[in-house]
Each structure stands twice: as C-alpha cells, then as structure tokens.
C-alpha cells in the first residue's frame, strides 16, 4: 500500500470500530427495555485495546500480513525500525461503555476486526492478490 498522508504526517490515534458492532448496537437499541426514546450511545472502541496509534496499526498489519512488502504508514526509525520519528498527539478518548452496560453490546476484538476488514478487501479485489 501507499503511505498514509492524512492527519499529522500520517500520525494519529485510531479509535477502531467494527461496522458489525454498529449494526448490532442499532438492533439492540430497538430491542432494549432499558433505553428510551432519545437515548444516546457512543459507538466507538470498547476500551484502550481498540485504539491504536498509526505505528501500532502498522505493526499489527505487518504481523497479520507478512507477505505484503510495504504496509505504509508513518515514518519509523530506531534499531528495528519500530520507533515513530515523531510523537503522536494522544487525542481525547471515548468508549462504548454505556452501550455495553445498557444494551449488552458485545464487541469484536481489534485483531478480528482488522483481519476481517483486510480479508474482505482482498476478497473483492481492492488489494489485488493476497499471495502476491
């Protein structure tokens, strides 16, 4: 892939949400007896484990897809190329705790979300052939 050029030179905090969790939360909102008309829920990462800085997302993608030559992302340095060149702003954090508590939302873990997302991109040809 190409290096990500958005944000602060590719550096950002990713609050990862699985679209399947969003769909499930919508269904649970319709079925709940706890929430009422006008109830609001933040559908974001379940906890800190669902938040990654760009360099952490790069490392996860590299571990899941070692056959990809260049994952892209923010510039790295250090002995193993595992230290960001510049620090990333640690953005304010929000989680879907209320949706988990009131609706009983059970979220997909981050690795499953990332793997299933990338695998779906390969399946529809957005990333070419997974073996190349």
Where are these regions (language model features)?
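Mid/C-terminal beta-alpha module of Rossmann-like enzyme folds, strongest
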Residues: 24-82, 116, 125-132
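Alpha-helical substrate-binding/gating segment
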Residues: 1-41
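Conserved C-terminal active-site "lid" loop/helix of NAD(P)H-dependent oxidoreductases
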Residues: 19, 79-104
């Amino acid at each position: 892939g190409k290096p990500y050029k958005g944000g602060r030179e590719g550096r950002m905090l990713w609050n990862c949400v699985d679209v399947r969790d969003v769909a499930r939360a919508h269904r649970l909102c319709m079925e709940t007896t706890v929430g009422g008309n006008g109830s609001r829920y933040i559908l974001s990462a379940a906890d800190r484990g669902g938040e990654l800085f760009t360099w952490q997302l790069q490392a996860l993608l590299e571990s899941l897809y070692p056959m990809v030559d260049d994952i892209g992302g923010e510039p790295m340095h250090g002995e193993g190329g595992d230290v960001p060149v510049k620090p990333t702003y640690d953005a304010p954090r929000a989680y879907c705790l209320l949706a988990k508590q009131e609706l009983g939302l059970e979220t997909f873990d981050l690795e499953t979300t990332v793997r299933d997302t990338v695998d779906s991109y390969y399946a529809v040809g957005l990333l070419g052939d997974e073996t190349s």
